């Protein structure tokens, strides 16, 4: 096997941070001059998370090739430089669909199709396909869910088989939670012992145990885990809850020397990772910054931060690059009093979304920003909000709307894209993935990007109606970015406003801590200027 494989499983509880751990490991290995690929295996039966409720699953992250994926792939992107595509994700739904399709085609020649060997073989095939596509030195495979869940069993069995065949090239990390009982004044290792016992019962013996805890674990506790989980002392690692930011995780793992331990066990003798640039940014996060802005994020899933995970992170990236602290204020567009809080903000961001709930509240937010000169950034649905508000209140088009919200609107300034109306299925049928966009010179977005040709990722069915584009321009709402292939409106800017920009794509999917997205940087710069001007009034 020409590549090494790291398997990451989780036990005791869900939401341990396996995705962040996998992303951090990818960064550390890349900084050792290794080429890394990543694969997320999710046990749920949905084909993808594209139609799942954000309250249940969080945001949907979209790759360049138009695949709707788990938000963990967003972590992979923000921490590392791995190439993410359809080969980087697989769900039980996809695996079963592939097997059933082959059965219908007669591939199995009349055999009884079973979880073992057919489903497990398909999972192994997915792993090999990812490696073949990316040709990595190391492939990191994260298995969603928790050891002990019924849904995870086929994936764990597939890993067991894979490890049997390629033992020298595989490394298994089991991540667990070590709780601290305040009443007893001590940490408890028993849940970790039982979790490892369950994993061993399946036939997987972990090569390392990564213990998450609220406080650092003593050497005595680590030795106890080592003894009862049958791994060497040196194979027990500890990560504590981060103090300031998730971006501290790679530094924490680096101090634990886990990547060095892994590479030595796999026979990959590389240089020590260089994280000097990362450390500089983390120091900024830890220390008071000279400037601060407050950004109002107006949406309908604001009670669940994971629903807008990439947006939150992109704002942080941009602010940090400008040596600026940021206070992100989630505002529910259905709250009758949210405008009072928005008035105190230095900028407003309306992210993507679907459906009529909270729609009118978002329009009132755009109106407030336009009239008060508050910087406004509309993403996907947020751009459509900007256009509808402008049509109603500047162009005097009474009851202008999107046909998504009102099929009978007299002024459909936002309408469904050609070809979408005939589609019956909802999953995977939108305009998805990266498309080119040509920017108009002399505009705010051109200034932000510093170039005229860009590529951005999309996830939408609706667009600005061609029939209203000239009217919009005549009234001061300029179309400053278009798709050269179809002429679709991708970016709008309002004249005579400090920064009122709407984009049909999702720039948050491209932002990283090291390289923040230029539009988010431009937005935070405008918010900083607004804040300074406001303080002098």
Swiss-Prot record:
<keyword id="KW-0479">Metal-binding</keyword>
<protein>
    <recommendedName>
        <fullName>CTP synthase</fullName>
        <ecNumber>6.3.4.2</ecNumber>
    </recommendedName>
</protein>
<feature type="binding site">
    <location>
        <begin position="149"/>
        <end position="151"/>
    </location>
    <ligand>
        <name>CTP</name>
    </ligand>
</feature>
<feature type="binding site">
    <location>
        <begin position="381"/>
        <end position="384"/>
    </location>
    <ligand>
        <name>L-glutamine</name>
    </ligand>
</feature>
<feature type="binding site">
    <location>
        <position position="55"/>
    </location>
    <ligand>
        <name>L-glutamine</name>
    </ligand>
</feature>
<dbReference type="GO" id="GO:0004359">
    <property type="term" value="F:glutaminase activity"/>
</dbReference>
<dbReference type="GO" id="GO:0003883">
    <property type="term" value="F:CTP synthase activity"/>
</dbReference>
<dbReference type="GO" id="GO:0046872">
    <property type="term" value="F:metal ion binding"/>
</dbReference>
<comment type="function">
    <text>Catalyzes the ATP-dependent amination of UTP to CTP with either L-glutamine or ammonia as the source of nitrogen. Regulates intracellular CTP levels through interactions with the four ribonucleotide triphosphates.</text>
</comment>
<dbReference type="InterPro" id="IPR004468">
    <property type="entry name" value="CTP_synthase"/>
</dbReference>
<dbReference type="InterPro" id="IPR017926">
    <property type="entry name" value="GATASE"/>
</dbReference>
<keyword id="KW-0436">Ligase</keyword>
<feature type="region of interest" description="Amidoligase domain">
    <location>
        <begin position="1"/>
        <end position="268"/>
    </location>
</feature>
<feature type="binding site">
    <location>
        <position position="224"/>
    </location>
    <ligand>
        <name>UTP</name>
    </ligand>
</feature>
<keyword id="KW-0460">Magnesium</keyword>
<dbReference type="Pfam" id="PF00117">
    <property type="entry name" value="GATase"/>
</dbReference>
<dbReference type="Pfam" id="PF06418">
    <property type="entry name" value="CTP_synth_N"/>
</dbReference>
<feature type="binding site">
    <location>
        <begin position="188"/>
        <end position="193"/>
    </location>
    <ligand>
        <name>CTP</name>
    </ligand>
</feature>
<dbReference type="InterPro" id="IPR033828">
    <property type="entry name" value="GATase1_CTP_Synthase"/>
</dbReference>
<feature type="binding site">
    <location>
        <begin position="15"/>
        <end position="20"/>
    </location>
    <ligand>
        <name>ATP</name>
    </ligand>
</feature>
<keyword id="KW-0665">Pyrimidine biosynthesis</keyword>
<dbReference type="InterPro" id="IPR027417">
    <property type="entry name" value="P-loop_NTPase"/>
</dbReference>
<dbReference type="InterPro" id="IPR017456">
    <property type="entry name" value="CTP_synthase_N"/>
</dbReference>
<feature type="binding site">
    <location>
        <position position="224"/>
    </location>
    <ligand>
        <name>CTP</name>
    </ligand>
</feature>
<feature type="active site" description="Nucleophile; for glutamine hydrolysis">
    <location>
        <position position="380"/>
    </location>
</feature>
<comment type="subunit">
    <text>Homotetramer.</text>
</comment>
<feature type="binding site">
    <location>
        <position position="14"/>
    </location>
    <ligand>
        <name>CTP</name>
    </ligand>
</feature>
<feature type="active site">
    <location>
        <position position="508"/>
    </location>
</feature>
<comment type="pathway">
    <text>Pyrimidine metabolism; CTP biosynthesis via de novo pathway; CTP from UDP: step 2/2.</text>
</comment>
<feature type="binding site">
    <location>
        <position position="14"/>
    </location>
    <ligand>
        <name>UTP</name>
    </ligand>
</feature>
<comment type="similarity">
    <text>Belongs to the CTP synthase family.</text>
</comment>
<dbReference type="GO" id="GO:0042802">
    <property type="term" value="F:identical protein binding"/>
</dbReference>
<feature type="binding site">
    <location>
        <position position="72"/>
    </location>
    <ligand>
        <name>Mg(2+)</name>
    </ligand>
</feature>
<dbReference type="GO" id="GO:0044210">
    <property type="term" value="P:'de novo' CTP biosynthetic process"/>
</dbReference>
<dbReference type="InterPro" id="IPR029062">
    <property type="entry name" value="Class_I_gatase-like"/>
</dbReference>
<feature type="binding site">
    <location>
        <position position="461"/>
    </location>
    <ligand>
        <name>L-glutamine</name>
    </ligand>
</feature>
<keyword id="KW-0547">Nucleotide-binding</keyword>
<keyword id="KW-0315">Glutamine amidotransferase</keyword>
<feature type="binding site">
    <location>
        <position position="142"/>
    </location>
    <ligand>
        <name>Mg(2+)</name>
    </ligand>
</feature>
<dbReference type="GO" id="GO:0005829">
    <property type="term" value="C:cytosol"/>
</dbReference>
<feature type="binding site">
    <location>
        <begin position="188"/>
        <end position="193"/>
    </location>
    <ligand>
        <name>UTP</name>
    </ligand>
</feature>
<dbReference type="GO" id="GO:0019856">
    <property type="term" value="P:pyrimidine nucleobase biosynthetic process"/>
</dbReference>
């Amino acid at each position: 096997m020409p590549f090494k494989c790291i398997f990451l499983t989780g036990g005791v509880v869900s939401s341990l941070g396996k995705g962040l751990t996998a992303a951090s490991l990818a960064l550390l290995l890349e900084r050792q001059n290794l080429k890394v690929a990543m694969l997320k295996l999710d046990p749920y039966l949905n084909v993808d998370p594209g139609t799942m409720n954000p309250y249940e699953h969080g945001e949907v992250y979209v790759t360049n090739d138009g695949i709707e994926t788990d938000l963990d792939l967003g972590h992979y992107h923000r921490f590392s430089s791995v190439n993410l595509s359809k080969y980087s994700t697989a769900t039980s739904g996809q695996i079963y669909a592939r097997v059933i399709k082959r059965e219908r085609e007669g591939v199995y020649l009349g055999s009884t199709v079973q979880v073992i060997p057919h489903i497990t073989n398909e999972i192994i095939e997915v792993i090999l396909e990812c490696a073949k596509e990316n040709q990595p030195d190391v492939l990191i495979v994260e298995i969603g869910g928790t050891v002990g869940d019924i849904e995870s069993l086929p994936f764990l069995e597939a890993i067991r088989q894979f490890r049997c065949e390629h033992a020298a090239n595989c490394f298994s990390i089991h991540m667990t939670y070590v709780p601290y009982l305040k009443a007893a004044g001590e940490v408890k290792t028993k849940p970790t012992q039982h979790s490892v016992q369950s994993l061993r019962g399946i036939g997987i013996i972990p090569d390392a145990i990564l213990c998450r805890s609220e406080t650092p674990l003593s050497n005595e506790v680590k030795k106890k885990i080592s003894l009862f989980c049958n791994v060497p002392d040196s194979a027990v690692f500890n990560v504590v809850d981060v103090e300031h930011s998730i971006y501290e995780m790679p530094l924490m793992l680096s101090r634990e020397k886990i990547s060095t331990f892994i590479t030595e066990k796999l026979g990959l003798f590389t240089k020590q990772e260089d994280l000097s640039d990362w450390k500089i940014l983390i120091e900024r996060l830890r220390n008071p910054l000279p400037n601060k802005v407050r950004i109002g994020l107006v949406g309908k899933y604001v009670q669940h931060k994971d629903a807008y995970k990439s947006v939150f992170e992109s704002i942080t990236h941009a602010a940090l690059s400008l040596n600026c602290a940021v206070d992100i204020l989630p505002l529910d567009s259905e709250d009758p009093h949210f405008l009072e809080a928005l008035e105190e903000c230095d900028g407003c961001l309306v992210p993507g979304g679907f459906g009529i709930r909270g729609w009118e509240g978002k329009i009132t937010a755009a109106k407030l920003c336009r009239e008060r000169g508050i910087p406004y950034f509309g993403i996907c649905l947020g751009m459509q909000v900007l256009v509808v508000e402008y049509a109603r209140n500047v162009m005097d088009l009474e009851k202008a709307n999107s046909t998504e919200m009102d099929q009978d609107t007299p002024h459909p300034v936002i309408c469904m894209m050609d070809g979408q109306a005939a589609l019956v299925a909802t999953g995977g049928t939108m305009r998805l993935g990266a498309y080119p966009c040509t920017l108009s010179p002399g505009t705010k977005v051109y200034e932000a990007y510093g170039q005229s040709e860009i590529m951005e990722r999309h996830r939408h069915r609706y667009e600005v109606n061609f029939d209203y584009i000239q009217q919009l321009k005549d009234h001061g709402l300029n179309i400053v970015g278009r798709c050269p292939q179809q002429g679709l409106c991708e970016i709008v800017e309002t004249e005579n406003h400090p920064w009122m920009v709407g984009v049909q794509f999702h720039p948050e999917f491209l932002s990283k801590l090291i390289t923040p997205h230029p539009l988010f940087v431009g937005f935070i710069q405008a918010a900083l200027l607004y804040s300074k001007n406001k303080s002098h009034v």
